[in-house]
Curated annotation (Swiss-Prot):
Location(s) in or outside the cell: Cytoplasm; Cytoplasm, Cytoskeleton, Microtubule organizing center, Centrosome
Assembly with partners or alone: Interacts with members of the heat shock protein 70 and 90 families and of the TCP-1 chaperonin family, as well as with HSPD1, STIP1 and tubulin; at least some of these proteins may be methylation substrates.
Protein name: EEF1A lysine methyltransferase 3
Single annotated GO MF: protein-lysine N-methyltransferase activity
Main function: Protein-lysine methyltransferase that selectively mono-, di- and trimethylates 'Lys-165' of the translation elongation factors EEF1A1 and EEF1A2 in an aminoacyl-tRNA and GTP-dependent manner. EEF1A1 methylation by EEF1AKMT3 is dynamic as well as inducible by stress conditions, such as ER-stress, and plays a regulatory role on mRNA translation.
Catalysed reaction equations from the record: L-lysyl-[protein] + 3 S-adenosyl-L-methionine = N(6),N(6),N(6)-trimethyl-L-lysyl-[protein] + 3 S-adenosyl-L-homocysteine + 3 H(+); L-lysyl-[protein] + S-adenosyl-L-methionine = N(6)-methyl-L-lysyl-[protein] + S-adenosyl-L-homocysteine + H(+); N(6)-methyl-L-lysyl-[protein] + S-adenosyl-L-methionine = N(6),N(6)-dimethyl-L-lysyl-[protein] + S-adenosyl-L-homocysteine + H(+); N(6),N(6)-dimethyl-L-lysyl-[protein] + S-adenosyl-L-methionine = N(6),N(6),N(6)-trimethyl-L-lysyl-[protein] + S-adenosyl-L-homocysteine + H(+)
Taxonomic classification: Eukaryota, Metazoa, Chordata, Craniata, Vertebrata
Gene Ontology annotations of biological process type: peptidyl-lysine methylation
Chief location category: cytoplasm
Organism: Bos taurus (Bovine)
Record-listed E.C. numbers: 2.1.1.-
InterPro entries, per database record: Methyltransf_16, SAM-dependent_MTases_sf
């Protein structure tokens, strides 16, 4: 789901390899979820073209559950989701009153747009845009109140790109929520223990032992990059 991946159609030798056989058969599944009193109808378009971006991952559900249990206030907030995949986290934020930009690589946007149209009523504040970490984050404003990401920390070569993107997007008084499956083999713990704390005040907001998912909350530690 991480939207730092260069478009695999144009960069076959990128650090974001596709597992062609991961979802070899192309098909769609529709799932229903309920958070904060909203019923979310989410379509997952499985196929080798989308790869890991096709599905709703456990970390996304954990983050939505956290927003519900903690009554996180999105009303009137400027929100951006990174590596959205299906868009479920950003869609919930929009339904909760946020002014939301949902982002991923260009090839994922059609799936996200379909889910936005299926769940966010006309007039709802949810837009879908392409964003590749470390490449075009500067075309986005740097004053978001909330920056969201679910299971986007799993490829070590992308960590510096993600860190730079977070530093740019998060406003001076903004908050970052990152939910992540803690995969030791992917260096996930190292990102949260060593990289992110260099620039952000970081705290573990919630730990889901059953799913091995951590939810972190971060705020700027010092002056933001120019």
């Amino acid at each position: 789901m991480a939207d730092s991946r260069p478009d695999p159609e144009s960069e076959p030798d990128s650090v974001f390899p596709r597992e062609v056989g991961l979802f070899a058969d192309c098909y769609s599944e529709k799932s229903r979820f309920c958070f904060c009193g909203h019923v979310l109808n989410i379509t997952e378009n499985f196929g080798s073209r989308l790869g890991v971006a096709a599905r709703v991952w456990d970390a996304a559900l954990s983050l939505c559950n956290y927003f519900e249990s903690q009554n996180v206030d999105f009303r009137g907030k400027k929100v951006i989701e990174l590596g959205a995949g299906t868009g479920i986290v950003g869609i919930l934020a929009a339904l909760q009153g946020g002014d939301v930009t949902i982002t991923d690589l260009p090839l994922v946007l059609e799936q996200i747009q379909g889910n936005v149209q299926a769940n966010v009523p006309p007039g709802g504040r949810a837009q879908v845009r392409a964003l590749s970490w470390g490449i075009d984050q500067h075309v986005f404003p740097g004053d978001y109140d909330l920056v969201l990401g679910a299971d986007i920390v799993y490829l070590e070569p992308t960590f510096p790109l993600l860190l730079g993107t977070l530093r740019h997007l998060c406003g001076p008084h903004g908050t970052i929520y990152l939910a992540s499956k803690m995969r030791e083999e992917h260096g996930t713990e190292s990102f949260f223990q060593h990289l992110l704390p260099q620039h952000f005040q970081l705290e573990l907001a919630q730990r889901d032992e059953d799913e091995n998912v951590n939810i972190y909350r971060a705020r700027h530690r010092g002056p933001r990059p120019a």
